Amino acid sequence: MSKLMKKDFNIVQRFPALIAISLIIIFTGLVFLLGEGLNLGIDYKGGAKVEIELVDEITDKEAFEEHFTSFMKGEGYTVVDKMMESPLTEGGISYEFRLAYEYNGAGVEVEAQEAFITRLNNEFKNDLTEEVESYLASVNSSNLFDEEGINVAVIGESSSKSLLNRTFIALALALVAILVYIMIRFTVSSGLASICGLAHDVLITVSLTAIFGKYLPVNMTFIAAIITIIGYSINSSIVIFDKIRECQKSTAFAYASDEEIANYAIKHSLVKILLSILTTLIMVVALVLFSVSTIQEFILPIIFGLLAGTFSALCLNPSIWVLFRKIGSKLKSKKA
């Protein structure tokens, strides 16, 4: 690390090449978005959540998932996403299947929605109860189960669209609040650079999610990951801009250019930011290894966002700050 700190950091001068890396990823993600789109979960396009609650954990989860995915398909429903596993607060474990808002491969029309919901909560629920009992008997399982262990929750298309709209509004308000905070604590240039960095991090995460969309459903867990990413990104930005402000107040940098100040801030914030991200990634890996699938769905977007946030904080935000400073100086000179 000491050898690294002795090297010259000319990150600002390399800004065009560095931003090109991000633009390539974003452009590739855009191609996937236009082609296949995001893998929207039932939270945002409607559907149903079917929970099977058991006392003990299933030994062969793959066989269990395959069996009931096939059973639900035979009943006329399409299973989306992987089976989710989560512990119950009162003891036991829940296995959740997510069904698309369709029947026999066709979308449910408005006039047929009531029939769709009624069938799920009656005939399908009864058939599923019998199938669970039959499956446990066929594998000689002593796992306890009763008919109250089946829960079905339907999310309509209208409510899912309303949720999607509220999500976008909440994220927009959060970005505005962050911009105001950074502008008050630092400068307008710092605030604008931070917002550009946050937009970069979200775009990279969404782009990579589109590229790996088959494995990453976009649901409330994904939105929670985006909010977490914004938090980490703004923290890294504050570290950089705090160092820049410190340099601007120091007489040692009285005659230094904005580029020199930015490069110095990057160099002397590098270790702090990398150690912060590294410790977070260690915890993320631990969650992957020891957590249930509900949490694991949250992990990959977080990794994308952490890497994007580190890249933007060190390689993009300071350069964008320099750019906005130049624009500000030109505007002032024109007014004068």
Which residues does each PLM region occupy?
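A structural signal for conserved, well-ordered secondary-structure elements
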Residues: 1-336
